[in-house]
Regions:
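C-terminal beta-strand edge segments of enzyme domains
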Residues: 132-134, 199-271
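Short polar catalytic/cofactor-binding loops
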Residues: 10-15
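Short hydrophobic-aromatic micro-motifs
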Residues: 40, 139-144, 165-167
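Conserved hydrophobic/aromatic positions in well-ordered beta-strands
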Residues: 7, 100-102, 109, 213, ...
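Active-site catalytic loop in hydrolytic enzyme cores
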Residues: 90-160, 173-175, 179-181, 238-255
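Extreme N-terminal starter segment of soluble prokaryotic enzymes
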Residues: 1-8
Length: 271
């Protein structure tokens, strides 16, 4: 039976620095690939930062060339990678908050945030969710931040057969106790493990708490990161259940990624 290896990439990005944030994502991806990670989850809007007031200017189309090096590394490593960005949608005046899944076969699929925080509707359009992912026999349901504030969202994921509820979030220190209890409760209530990837630094005026975490199907916290900063939380499941480890600070200790040859964005299948 295959052993699933999942990870949360808790990254301290720079708002609006797309080139620098892509480089940081690549660094996380290479380290995760070295550790055998099969699914790597980044936080909400990880590529741009959480900047609602300029989201329209930062919004990217589905076939953006920005994803090309990330797609290439995901494909080379055979690692499903989920990154966050504001998605420009034809026919909509406002972008959607998207979690883009880069598949090992080169394809890209998108999950769009269904439930918006109060005030986000000024800058974003609500999305329609997305399909379950499958990693080593585990069905993975995606969630973006305020989605998990709606109990119906997690209940629907469990009803669809999800084994793991993967939440890309931005949670500050004041809200962390409340929000972590909600996620733990979903794990316990639905018998569905929960992986949470939080930002590791300030973004959009919010001081992120970090403390990315994983709860097993009984609601037990298997592993979490300590505070903010660049951290990689790696989780695996063996015969004795889930186990995890937190790895700190990708730079300067982590080597620069050796990039694979990048194909044209137009040559990558998008669905």
């Amino acid at each position: 039976m295959p052993i699933p290896v999942l990870a949360a990439a808790q990254c301290a990005i720079r708002d609006g620095d797309l080139e620098g944030n892509v480089a940081l994502h690549l660094q996380f991806m290479q380290r995760a690939a070295e550790l055998g990670v099969e699914l790597l989850l980044f936080p909400e809007l990880s590529l741009t930062g959480y900047e609602p007031s300029i989201a329209s200017a930062l919004a990217l189309p589905r076939a953006t060339p920005l994803l090309a090096p990330l797609q290439a590394l995901a494909q080379q490593a055979g690692m499903t990678t989920i990154v966050g960005l504001p998605l420009r949608v034809p026919g909509r005046a406002k972008p959607q908050i998207a979690a883009c899944t880069l598949h090992p076969d080169g394809a890209v699929t998108t999950y769009t945030k269904q439930y918006l925080h109060a005030g986000e509707e000024q800058f974003f359009s609500a999305g329609s969710g997305g399909e379950l992912l499958s990693i080593s026999g585990q069905a993975i349901a995606l969630s973006v931040c305020a989605d998990f504030a709606e109990p119906e969202h997690a209940a629907n994921a469990a009803s669809a057969g999800a084994d793991v509820y993967a939440a890309s979030v931005l949670i500050g220190e004041p809200g962390y106790p409340h929000d972590s209890v909600i996620l733990q409760g979903y794990a316990q209530q639905h018998g569905m493990a929960v992986l949470m990837a939080n930002h590791g630094g300030p973004t959009g005026g919010w001081a992120a708490a970090g403390r990315s975490a994983f709860w097993d199907e009984l609601g037990q916290c298997v592993a979490s990161t300590e505070g903010a900063g660049n951290r990689l939380l790696v989780i695996s499941r063996g015969l004795k259940g889930w186990s995890g480890v937190s790895i700190s600070e990708p730079d300067p200790g982590w080597p620069a990624p050796q990039l694979p040859q990048v194909r044209s964005a137009q040559s990558v299948e998008n669905r």
